[in-house]
């Protein structure tokens, strides 16, 4: 599962 990560 891909989750939004600030900085990625």
UniProtKB/Swiss-Prot annotation:
Keyword Secreted annotated: yes
Main location: secreted
InterPro entries: Adipokinetic_hormone_CS (IPR002047)
Keywords, alphabetical: Amidation, Flight, Hormone, Neuropeptide, Pyrrolidone carboxylic acid, Secreted
Family per record: Belongs to the AKH/HRTH/RPCH family.
Function: This hormone, released from cells in the corpora cardiaca, causes release of diglycerides from the fat body and stimulation of muscles to use these diglycerides as an energy source during energy-demanding processes.
Chain positions found as Pyrrolidone carboxylic acid: 1
Protein name: Adipokinetic hormone
Compartmental location: Secreted
Modified residues (Tryptophan amide): 8
């Amino acid at each position: 599962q891909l989750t939004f990560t600030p900085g990625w």
